[in-house]
Amino acid sequence: GWGGVTPDRGGAKDRRMVHEDSIRNAYVSMFMTDETARYFARRYKLDEDAVSRILVASRGNHRVIADFMARLRSEKSKRGGLDLLQRISAKDLRDVTLEVLMDHMQSRMCKNADHFRRYVRNPRVSNEILTPYKGFFKKAVSKEDAEAYKAEPMKLVAWVAQNIRVDNDCNLGGAPISPEGVWKARVADAHSRDIFFVSMARSMAIPARINGVTGKVQLIGDDGAMDVDLNHHPEEPVFMAEGIASKGKLVASYKPIRSLDNPKYYSHFTLS
C-alpha cells in the first residue's frame, strides 16, 4: 500500500522530490483507480474530482497524463493544464503524447480568456490526430508575420486561400493530413486544409474553430463567430498578389464528408 508517505510540512521540498519518483513509479498498474487518482491529486495539490475523472478515463495512458500533471507547478499552470485535458476527448486522453500536451501548454495568449481556453490553447480542431503544431508554427512563421496576422486575421485567410491548393483526391478516406504536412506540401484535401488553417490561427493566438454543426471554418471575435471562405477565387481580384493569377484555379465549394456517408472516413479511429 501507500504506507510511509508523510504529508508535506514546512520546507518539505527535498522530501517531496524524493517521493515524486517513487510516486511516479508506483503507477505501474494497467489502469488507474479512482482512489489512486485522488491520492495523486492530493500529493500534487490538484483538483481531486477533475484529476480522478481524467486519469480514470485515460486508461492505459495514465502514466503520460500523470507525468504531465506532475509538471504543473504554479496555480495558473495547474488550472490551465487541467482545462487543456478537459478540452480533448476521452479517446485523446487514451493516446495523447506528453510532447503534444507540453506543446499546447505553451500556447501564445490572446486577450479573451474564454476564447483562449476554447479556441487557442485547445489542440483539438476536428477528427485529426493531435500533433505538437504550436511549436512547429512558432518556428516556421516569423514573429513579425505572426503579429501581422493576429492584428488582421483576414490576411491569414487570404494567405491560406492563395497558397494551399485543394485536391480532394490526395487523401481519400485517410486520417486528415497533419498541419505540418499541409505546410510542407502546400496541397491538401479541403478538410485537412480547414484543420490546417485553424491550427495555424491558434498557434498565432487567433481564436478559430470548425463549426461542429455547419462544418464551416470560423474566426471567433468579440462579436461572435464569423464564417471564412478559404477557397481560392481567382476571378475576384481583392486578394490578388503578384504571380498568383497564373497558378489560380477555380475550386468548387466542397461539402465535408459526413462520417455516415463514408464510414471509411473514420476508419483510423480505434474502438476500445
Language model: regions and residue ranges:
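The substrate-binding groove and active-site-proximal loops of carbohydrate-active enzymes
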Residues: K184-A188
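Loop/turn residues immediately N-terminal
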Residues: G215-K216
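N-terminal accessory/pre-domain segments preceding catalytic cores
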Residues: G1-C170, S178-V182, S192, R202-S203, ...
